[in-house]
């Protein structure tokens, strides 16, 4: 299965709508244990991508992933800009000179997540976006190797992200401002994990509705 980059403007728009719809709720999560500016910072990057969406849809996957990464690095404040920038730049490099099929995307996404782990000096279980990205990447790789339909694959990845974000509620924060709260960080969902889950769900919904072949 191959999907054209021409789908990216729709994906970017869907992400923008999902973050805007949930902005107040996510900001409340962030204010509880974080800095409270996560959504504002993230939306700055999303708006920059929206402004470039027509151009982005005409590039090949390797180039466009790196372009998205550099845009996020330069426009999103806080740790999120650096981490998401690293994710997409690494994906782009991994796709260079590759056929952009599902196994290649799964492998590239996994490499991107590994780069985020290194850049953020974090891993699963530390109440960060990685608690969504890691299981989503694992699910994508597992599903890419299995003989299942595209709809099943997307459902599996979406479910993995949902399970991951909910799991942060019971985690003790060890990164960022939330880490200073100690046990008071327990009982709260991580805002960065939540926006990662929202974006994965938005991406999956657009691909599912595109009628792309398996």
Show where each model-derived region lies:
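N-terminal loops that bind phosphate or other acidic moieties
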Residues: 1-214
